[in-house]
Amino acid sequence: MASLKDMRVRIASTKATQKITKAMQMVAASKLRRAQMAAEAARPYAEKMDAVISNIAGAAAGSPGAPVLLAGTGKDQVHLLLVCTGERGLSGAFNSSIVRLARERAYALMNQGKTVKFFCVGRKGYEQLRRTFDKQIIENIELRSVRQLGFVNAEDIAQKVIARFNNGEFDVCTLFYSRFKSVISQIPTAQQLIPLVVEAPAAGSVATSYEYEPEEDEILSTLLPRNLAVQIFRALLENNASFYGAQMSAMDNATRNAGDMIRKQTLIYNRTRQAMITKELIEIISGAEAI
């Protein structure tokens, strides 16, 4: 049985840990609001741009001059999974849930005889995926040194993806990230980027015909690479908000658990101390009676 000194050390250690988790919770809460506002502000632009491009692409999809980012390679053999995760842990299941979704997709594709490659953005995703897919990871980008996420970061990733696509390294690219819903809810999401998926018009909607100048193909050649960067930037912002939400929730749970441990350890300490005092009193009384 542990001595009273060991128990005091354990209680003090748990209290110190509780202070750390409480501080991390407060830091995450302060950063969450800004990250949430950035993610929510990016959604309308990204969704509207996707809708505009889908409208233009609907008319150009069948033309022989359609951009390759829209038309694709005509094959469905090599898949690139662009997996965006965080740079740090202590955030509950935030990173592992994204990796799990990507891993499930990879196994499903491999069972169909497809070739799977990984493009990792974020240290935690890379560390988890390399355990089983080390030889299939073709690139890894870490954003640890980036203090404030900017569109330039997404553009850099998009340019590297497009360069590999133009080199014929893959046929289909799918983006994996975590969509922020609330502090306690982040949704792992998969979104196909290449070739662009043109959404069918909603049932009952009236199709509107537009005339474009210059031609649709020329407009798409400019807009498609930018849309790729916009969708990646949106994913990075969603991930950022999801990370702080998950970390805030995880640190809150850790703080509560530390409080429960302190109460239990203190109760055991007091009972042990009381038992030792009672034992000593009995020994003193027994000795006095013997005299």
Curated annotation (Swiss-Prot):
InterPro entries: ATP_synth_F1_ATPase_gsu, ATP_synth_F1_gsu, ATP_synth_F1_gsu_CS. The lineage of its organism: Bacteria, Pseudomonadati, Pseudomonadota, Alphaproteobacteria, Hyphomicrobiales. GO terms for biological process: proton motive force-driven plasma membrane ATP synthesis. One of its GO terms (molecular function) is ATP binding. Keywords: ATP synthesis, Cell inner membrane, Cell membrane, CF(1), Hydrogen ion transport, Ion transport, Membrane, Transport. Produces ATP from ADP in the presence of a proton gradient across the membrane. The gamma chain is believed to be important in regulating ATPase activity and the flow of protons through the CF(0) complex. F-type ATPases have 2 components, CF(1) - the catalytic core - and CF(0) - the membrane proton channel. CF(1) has five subunits: alpha(3), beta(3), gamma(1), delta(1), epsilon(1). CF(0) has three main subunits: a, b and c. Transmembrane segments: none annotated. Belongs to the ATPase gamma chain family. It is found in: Cell inner membrane. PANTHER family: ATP SYNTHASE GAMMA CHAIN, ATP SYNTHASE SUBUNIT GAMMA, MITOCHONDRIAL. Gene3D superfamilies: 3.40.1380.10, ATP synthase, gamma subunit, helix hairpin domain. It is a peripheral membrane protein. It comes from the Bacteria. One of its GO terms (cellular component) is plasma membrane. Its main location: membrane. This is ATP synthase gamma chain.
